Amino acid sequence: ALNEIETKFKTKEKYYALVIGNNNYDHLEKLDAAENDAVVIADVLKNKYGFEVDLLLNADQETTVDTLFSITDKLKKNDNLLIYYAGHGELDKAENRGYWLPVDASYEKRSKWISNQTIVDRIKATKAKHVLLVADSCFSGTLMRSGTNLQNQEPIDEKYIERLKNKKTRL
């Protein structure tokens, strides 16, 4: 049975991860755990699950956006992507939009902020079959406005999971 499972998962699918951990901000309060969390997650994804990992530690706005575009542009229809972000987040109350704050961001200079909408747009544009986004930051809930109330959901059965594996998904 184990050989059957191993054979089933040996496909042309590739697994990519963009892992970002920002602790050391130029103009904002420094964080304690974001960088270490990113290192641990990148290590597990690479060494336990075989992901090709791009790890960005204390990345500025240009590096973060350029890497996001580079990865999402190269993905093919059977590829899978995990994006993990740990760092500061902020809400622009006037626009009611959330942002990731790279290490060169400041509250006075919003041009360095990365809009959650930019992240969502890149996820929508990529050809990857499956994309999972995990954001450990303030205002990460603004990434997906159509959030589902999981408390009222029926339990997920295996047939549903099998159907999802064959569809393009974004979580």
Protein language model annotation of sequence segments:
Residues 1-9:
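Compositionally biased, proline/threonine/alanine/serine-rich low-complexity intrinsically disordered stretches
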Residues 7-8, 14, 52, 59-86, ...:
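Caspase-like (clan CD) cysteine peptidase catalytic core
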Residues 17-26, 46-51:
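Acidic/histidine-rich, surface-exposed loop or edge segments in extracytoplasmic proteins
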Residues 17-19, 53-56, 161-163, 169-171:
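Conserved beta-strand scaffold positions in the cores of enzyme catalytic domains, especially
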Residues 24-39:
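Glycine- and acidic-residue-enriched helix-capping/strand-helix junction motifs
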Residues 26-30, 54, 108-110:
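A generic structural signal for short coil/turn motifs at secondary-structure boundaries
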Residues 45, 131-171:
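Active-site-proximal C-terminal subdomain of hydrolase catalytic domains
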